[in-house]
């Protein structure tokens, strides 16, 4: 049974978010780096830095929270894995789903790399639907 690195990073982020941790440390791979760059660019993550520990590299993410009227902090990061190793989901550029009417993003793995749904529609290419983020 293989590892699903995308599901692992989604789980790391979701668990840190539920426990109200400000930072989460995820293992560094090329795929995780590309997904984290998208999260940073789209404003779902506040800061990212690369960290080395015992000859292994990690990405340390600072999660973004918004302050509620009552003074408590509320996260606004929801992630859902779509295509799994056992069931791959592909979509052409015309059928890429819109999350919350365009408020969320879909991360796709295309022949030109990992990108968001908006970028894939602009370049008119489809690919494997990795996850939804809203």
Curated annotation (Swiss-Prot):
Instruction: Give the superkingdom in one word.
Output: Eukaryota
GO cellular component labels: chloroplast; ribonucleoprotein complex; ribosome
Which compartment or compartments is the protein found in?
Answer: Plastid, Chloroplast
One MF term from GO for this chain? rRNA binding
Spell out the Pfam families in the cross-references.
Answer: Ribosomal_S8
Predominant location category = plastid
A biological-process GO annotation: translation
Keywords in UniProt for this one? Chloroplast, Plastid, Ribonucleoprotein, Ribosomal protein, RNA-binding, rRNA-binding
The protein's matches in HAMAP family, at most eight in alphabetical order, are given as: Ribosomal_uS8_B
Under the subunit heading, UniProt states: Part of the 30S ribosomal subunit.
- Tell me which family the UniProt entry assigns to this protein: Belongs to the universal ribosomal protein uS8 family.
Classification via PANTHER family: 40S RIBOSOMAL PROTEIN S15A
Q: Summarize the protein's role.
A: One of the primary rRNA binding proteins, it binds directly to 16S rRNA central domain where it helps coordinate assembly of the platform of the 30S subunit.
Q: Any idea what this protein is called?
A: Small ribosomal subunit protein uS8c
Q: Which organism is it from?
A: Glycine max (Soybean)
Q: What is the lineage of its organism?
A: Eukaryota, Viridiplantae, Streptophyta, Embryophyta, Tracheophyta
């Amino acid at each position: 049974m293989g590892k699903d690195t995308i599901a692992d990073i989604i789980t790391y982020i979701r668990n840190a978010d539920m426990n109200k941790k400000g930072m989460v440390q995820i293992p560094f791979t090329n795929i995780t780096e590309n997904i984290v760059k998208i999260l940073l660019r789209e404003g779902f993550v506040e800061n990212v830095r690369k960290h080395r520990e015992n000859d292994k590299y990690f990405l340390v993410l600072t999660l973004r929270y918004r302050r509620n009227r009552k003074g408590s902090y509320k996260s606004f990061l929801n992630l859902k894995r779509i295509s799994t190793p056992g069931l791959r989901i592909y979509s052409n550029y015309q059928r890429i789903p819109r999350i919350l009417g365009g408020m969320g993003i879909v991360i796709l793995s295309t022949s030109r790399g990992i990108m968001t749904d908006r970028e894939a529609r602009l370049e008119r290419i489809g690919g494997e639907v990795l996850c939804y983020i809203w």
